[in-house]
């Protein structure tokens, strides 16, 4: 089934009903027409309807059979109906012939109408008057038409039933009319006419049957709900809307109104129309040329009028004279103008050349004279061609010399800006007028005109792409591979693509050569540009070499910046042996016991010394730097990642502060290890060492043992294992150690935050609100230590209710201290349920 409901092998939909066809048959064989004739105009309309398949062949045959059934008793109407049937057989195509030669129609015509009512063996002349004579005449006409149809249908397998009925009647003794009753000279002529008539009828062109396919027969695009299928009325194929959008009338198929055809049929019909127009226009041109030749012929025309018997010779002579005149006019124009591009004027031909040749043409051998004139004209045209070719060769030899002279000044292009090189005065420049372009430009234009284009046109590219698409679709479809030899469109496209192969190779070779040329020119331009930039930079360095550029607002050279994260680290470690490189945690502090006041009274460290004393492996060197405000103390790890090329002015504004690397740790402390902490009396270095190695909390020095940074050499041999009283394990959140930073930090300090994947945006603000300030950490630690010692003495095995109430009264204070990590680790400490923190809305 095709789309929306018709069988795949059906013919086009009928556009006329059987009643309308019956009415037309009645009009064609009307009773008002005398002597059994038919109305030819209506009869040919009927044949066009049947041939164009506006009505099916079977319905047309049955309409004619119905007409015979209604009028078989009237000899005149029966004769006109037989003539209409014969006309339809000769003009309605092979499909209608199959229906006429069927058993249904032929048995009714022969066995019923002829044998019963118009039997020539039973009817004799003289019996029954004129009525019998008319019947005998109708019977003979039936036998005559049957004999003609047998001749027409012979050698056709599907039309054998007519020949069978013919042989049956002949065996029964019916005498058929003899078509060869004339003299023997006309026998061959009658046979040729019969064969011609048979060929014409059998080969009469009719619209083909519609074929069905699931793809367009041109582009092979499958049909769908949007891509509808359409049948071509000329070839019967199925096509998409894109390739069947043309409508033309098909007169040769009996279709007078415009109908849908495919692109191939449209091109074929359009080509035939153009050919017919060209033939008609050539006939008009020949007629005009004859009139012009008669005008120029003078006495030749009068002489040809006298010789009316030799019309063919006169026509050949006229053509010869026309060619002669055209050649002479072109030769005269070329010799008179003196230029190769001069065009002979049409108003130039005069009557003198024919007048001078009149005696020659009238006397002697006219044919020999005309041949000599033709040879002279051809020689003149060849001579003119040679002179033009020599002029072009001389002009091309002069052009290379002029082009080399014009290209020399352009080679010194980069020296134009310097007055020392007078390049323009050493080379003469060619002078050109406004009407004459430079010879190099003329040569380029002429080369572009002479060199044929090697690139493929858009139509050729589309042909290649279409061929590739079709071949890819054929590779994936085995059904198409079987029919590939019968696909005329694909074979034609293959022939076109094969012809394009040499052109494609030339185009590819030309493109490769152009690419190599352009690449070489690009390399030259890059080299010249680089050399010019170096030269210009040297000039600028020489011009500004004597001036000193201040380094206050400029950076350190690039080499120093590059060495910040590479070689400078090793050099700093060698120059500062008293500062060990630490990968994690905080730097060790060595020296004598000092207080914070003494540390603040020390002279400020210079910027160079400060940056040299910074730890090298803080773990944050790869982080990007952030700008600093003037009133905000910078973070130490932030200072460690600043480039060494920072301005001196910013270094001088920074206070001498200590470095606290590795501050970006999880903001929430770990409370799960409180029960596993060791007692206070045990050495704290073990706890510190274990907790530092695990990474849960860092080591912080107390306020009483903060070292002097300038006396680091005195404690150079100290190790973490021997420093038993310098470090205390705390569970504070990981921000700077408990130092008195009141003089260094403003009261409302906002720490500089850096981008980190492990911290929320407001981690430090939340920590400062949730935990106690740094100033009270040491004091709270001492106080808590004393309280725990007293509690351990008076503590019983089970806590009292009063202690629980006391704990509730001090819940908020204990929570802050517990979170800050200032409490000592005790083995006898019991787990106490902490109150749930309030959620800030």
UniProtKB/Swiss-Prot annotation:
It is found in: Endosome membrane. Residues 273-317, 329-371, 384-459, 558-841 are annotated as: Disordered. GO terms for molecular function: phosphatidylinositol-3-phosphate binding; ubiquitin binding; zinc ion binding. A zinc finger (FYVE-type) spans 210-270. Zn(2+) 2 binds at residues 232, 235, 262, 265. It comes from the Eukaryota. Residues 361-371, 669-678 have a biased composition (Acidic residues). Residues 392-411, 428-457, 558-584, 819-830 have a biased composition (Low complexity). Keywords: Endosome, Membrane, Metal-binding, Repeat, Zinc, Zinc-finger. Zn(2+) 1 binds at residues 216, 219, 240, 243. It is a peripheral membrane protein. SMART domains: FYVE, UIM, VHS. One of its GO terms (biological process) is protein transport to vacuole involved in ubiquitin-dependent protein catabolic process via the multivesicular body sorting pathway. CDD domains: GAT_Vps27. Residues 776-787 have a biased composition (Basic and acidic residues). Transmembrane segments: none annotated. Component of the ESCRT-0 complex which is the sorting receptor for ubiquitinated cargo proteins at the multivesicular body (MVB) and recruits ESCRT-I to the MVB outer membrane. Belongs to the VPS27 family. The FYVE domain is involved in the binding to phosphatidylinositol 3-phosphate (PtdIns(3)P) which is required for the association to endosomal membranes. Both IUM domains are necessary for efficient binding to ubiquitin. This is Vacuolar protein sorting-associated protein 27. The lineage of its organism: Eukaryota, Fungi, Dikarya, Ascomycota, Saccharomycotina. The gene is VPS27.
């Amino acid at each position: 089934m095709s789309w929306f409901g018709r069988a795949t092998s059906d013919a086009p939909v009928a556009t006329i009903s059987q009643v309308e066809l019956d009415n037309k048959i009645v009009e064609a064989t009307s009773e008002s027409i005398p002597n059994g004739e038919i109305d030819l105009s209506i009869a040919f309309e009927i044949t066009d309807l049947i041939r164009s398949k506006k009505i099916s062949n079977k319905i047309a045959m049955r309409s004619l059979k119905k007409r015979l059934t209604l009028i078989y008793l009237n000899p005149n109407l029966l004769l006109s109906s037989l003539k209409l049937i014969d006309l339809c057989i000769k003009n309605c195509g092979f499909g209608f012939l199959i229906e006429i030669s069927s058993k249904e129609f032929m048995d009714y015509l022969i066995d019923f109408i002829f044998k019963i009512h118009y039997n020539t063996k039973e009817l004799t002349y003289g019996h029954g008057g004129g009525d019998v004579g008319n019947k005998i005449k109708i019977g003979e006409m039936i036998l005559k038409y049957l004999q003609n149809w047998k001749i027409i249908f012979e050698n056709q397998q599907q039309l054998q039933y007519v020949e069978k009925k013919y042989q049956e009647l002949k065996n029964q003794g019916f005498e058929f009319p003899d078509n060869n009753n004339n003299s023997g000279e006309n026998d061959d002529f009658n046979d040729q006419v019969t064969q011609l008539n048979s060929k014409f009828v059998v080969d009469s062109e009719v619209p083909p049957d519609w074929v069905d396919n699931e793809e367009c027969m041109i582009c092979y695009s499958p049909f769908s709900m949007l891509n509808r299928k359409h049948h071509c009325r000329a070839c019967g194929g199925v096509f998409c809307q894109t390739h069947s959008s043309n409508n033309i009338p098909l007169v040769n198929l009996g279709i007078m109104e415009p109908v849908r055809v495919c692109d191939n049929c449209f091109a074929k019909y359009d080509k035939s129309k153009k050919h017919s127009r060209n033939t008609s226009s050539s006939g008009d041109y020949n007629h005009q040329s004859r009139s012009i030749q008669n005008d120029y012929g003078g006495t030749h025309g009068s002489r040809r009028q006298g010789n009316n018997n030799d019309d063919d010779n006169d026509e050949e002579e006229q053509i010869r004279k026309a060619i002669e005149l055209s050649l002479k006019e072109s030769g005269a124009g070329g010799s008179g103008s003196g230029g190769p591009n001069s065009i002979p004027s049409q108003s130039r031909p005069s009557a003198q050349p024919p007048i001078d040749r009149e005696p020659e043409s009238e006397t002697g051998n006219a044919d020999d004279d005309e041949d000599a004139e033709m040879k002279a004209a051809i020689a003149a045209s060849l001579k003119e061609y040679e002179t033009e070719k020599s002029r072009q060769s001389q002009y091309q030899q002069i052009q290379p010399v002029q082009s080399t002279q014009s290209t020399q000044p352009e080679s010194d292009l980069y020296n134009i800006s310097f007055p020392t090189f007078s390049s323009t005065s050493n080379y003469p420049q060619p002078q050109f007028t406004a009407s004459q372009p430079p010879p190099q430009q003329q040569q380029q234009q002429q080369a572009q005109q002479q060199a044929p284009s090697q690139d493929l046109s858009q139509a050729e590219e589309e042909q290649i792409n279409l061929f590739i698409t079709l071949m890819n679709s054929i590779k994936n479809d085995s059904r198409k591979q079987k029919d590939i030899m019968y696909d005329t469109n694909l074979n034609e496209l293959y022939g076109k693509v094969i012809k394009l192969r040499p052109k494609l190779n030339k185009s590819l070779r030309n493109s490769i050569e152009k690419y190599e040329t352009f690449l070489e020119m690009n390399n030259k331009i890059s080299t010249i540009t680089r050399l010019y930039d170096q030269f210009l930079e040297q000039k600028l360095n020489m011009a500004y070499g004597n001036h000193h550029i201040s380094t206050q607002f400029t950076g350190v050279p690039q080499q120093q910046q590059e060495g910040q994260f590479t070689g400078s680290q090793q050099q700093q470690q060698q120059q500062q042996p008293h500062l060990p490189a630490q990968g994690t945690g905080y730097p060790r502090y060595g020296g004598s016991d000092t207080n914070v006041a003494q540390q603040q009274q020390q002279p400020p460290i210079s910027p160079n010394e400060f940056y040299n004393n910074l730890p090298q492996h803080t773990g944050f060197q790869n982080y990007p730097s952030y700008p600093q405000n003037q009133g905000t103390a910078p973070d130490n790890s932030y200072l460690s990642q600043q480039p060494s090329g920072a301005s001196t002015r910013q270094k001088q504004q920074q206070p001498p502060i200590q470095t606290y690397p590795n501050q970006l740790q999880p903001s929430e402390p770990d409370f799960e290890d409180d029960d596993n902490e060791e007692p206070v009396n045990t050495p704290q270095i073990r706890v510190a060492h274990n907790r530092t190695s695990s990474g849960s909390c860092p080591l912080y020095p107390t306020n009483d043992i903060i070292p002097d940074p300038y006396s680091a050499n005195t404690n150079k041999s100290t190790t973490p294992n021997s420093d038993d009283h310098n470090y205390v394990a705390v569970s504070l959140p990981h921000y700077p150690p408990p130092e008195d930073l009141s003089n260094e930090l403003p009261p409302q300090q906002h720490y500089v935050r850096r981008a980190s994947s492990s911290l929320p945006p407001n981690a430090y603000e939340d920590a400062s609100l949730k935990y106690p300030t740094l100033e009270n950490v040491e004091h709270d630690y001492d106080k808590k230590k004393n309280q725990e010692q007293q509690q351990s003495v008076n503590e019983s095995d089970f806590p009292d209710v009063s202690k629980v109430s006391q704990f509730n009264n001090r819940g908020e204070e204990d929570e802050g201290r517990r979170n800050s990590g200032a409490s000592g680790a005790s083995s006898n400490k019991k787990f106490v349920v902490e109150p749930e923190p309030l959620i800030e809305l």
